[in-house]
Amino acid sequence: MSDSKDELIRMFFDEEAILFGRFILTSGKESNYYINVKKLSTKPRALKLIAKLMAGEAQKRGITFDRVAGPELGAVPIATALALETEKPLVIVRKKPKGHGTGSQLEGEVKAGDKVLLVEDVTTTGGSVLRAAEVLEREGAEIAAIMVVVDREEGAEETIGAKYTFLPLVRVSELFARRKEPQKE
């Protein structure tokens, strides 16, 4: 494990971004834990690290892309930081088309044939990020890969991986393995 990835995992605990209790997830599933990536993506140091890790992973895997996109709300700061890190234009995918103005479901420009690196904060089943991919593809974009900060390992990798390259920075099993390790003073 890289030092940077190790640092990101440590940040989840330092920032208390893993909560235990009873939670209903975006997927509709009930869970006894919640991964709150927003606690990290609202902290400049953590957000920079996430962007650096994502850019490095894309480069390591040979993933080329013209634009960075993320679905609202959780992925917007992540996509923004990655766009700044890579100097690629940003696209924000709305959950629903605007009811005013242009009525667009996208903020930012996508041209036919653009390769888009689509990012997400957390995946469970992958439904939210797949809906965003469909919106981008309707505009003519090609999804270069889907990258996520944390995969909960509840089916997203299989579902997304059936059609796209799926790259989680951290799997929930890696977070929980760290939780069980003795903490360094």
UniProtKB/Swiss-Prot annotation:
GO terms for biological process: 'de novo' UMP biosynthetic process; pyrimidine nucleobase biosynthetic process; UMP biosynthetic process. 5-phospho-alpha-D-ribose 1-diphosphate binds at R94, K95, K98, H100, E120, D121, V122, T123, T124, T125, G126, G127, S128. Keywords: Glycosyltransferase, Magnesium, Pyrimidine biosynthesis, Transferase. Gene3D superfamilies: 3.40.50.2020. Orotate binds at T124, R152. Its cofactor is Mg(2+). The keyword S-adenosyl-L-methionine does not apply. It is an enzyme of class 2 (transferase). It catalyses: orotidine 5'-phosphate + diphosphate = orotate + 5-phospho-alpha-D-ribose 1-diphosphate. Its EC number is 2.4.2.10. One of its GO terms (molecular function) is magnesium ion binding. InterPro entries: OPRT, Or_phspho_trans_dom, PRibTrfase_dom, PRTase-like. Pathway: Pyrimidine metabolism; UMP biosynthesis via de novo pathway; UMP from orotate: step 1/2. It comes from the Archaea. PANTHER family: OROTATE PHOSPHORIBOSYLTRANSFERASE, URIDINE 5'-MONOPHOSPHATE SYNTHASE. Belongs to the purine/pyrimidine phosphoribosyltransferase family. PyrE subfamily. HAMAP family: PyrE. Homodimer. Catalyzes the transfer of a ribosyl phosphate group from 5-phosphoribose 1-diphosphate to orotate, leading to the formation of orotidine monophosphate (OMP). This is Orotate phosphoribosyltransferase. It comes from Thermococcus kodakarensis (strain ATCC BAA-918 / JCM 12380 / KOD1).
